[in-house]
Amino acid sequence: MLKSAIEDFEKDRYEEALPLFEKLAREGNAEAMYYLGMMYYEGWGVDKDLDKAIEWWKRANRRGSLDAKYMLQTICSTSSVFARE
C-alpha cells in the first residue's frame, strides 16, 4: 500500500494518496507520516497547515524518520514556529 501511495504522490494524485497515507500513518508507518507532513506543508491535496505538518513530522521523527528529522530541523532553523512551544 505504501508503494501505491508514493506512486500517487509522485504523479500529483494527492487525493488518491491522502487516504492511503492516513491509513498507513494510523498503523504507525513513519514514511507515511513524513509524506503527510509534506502534503500539509506544501498544501498538496489539502489546505496548507504548518501545525499539522510539524505534528506529522514529529510523529515520524519519533519513529526514526530521518527525512522528518531534517524537515523539523529546517523549519526550526528558518522560522519562529518553535518559539511558541
Which role fits each region the language model picked out?
Residues 10-11, 26, 44-48, 62, ...:
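Short coil/turn and helix-start
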Residues 2-8, 23, 35-42, 71-78:
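Hydrophobic face of amphipathic alpha-helices that form TPR/SEL1-like repeat modules
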Residues 9, 18-19:
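Extended, folded domain segments that form the structural surfaces/walls around functional sites
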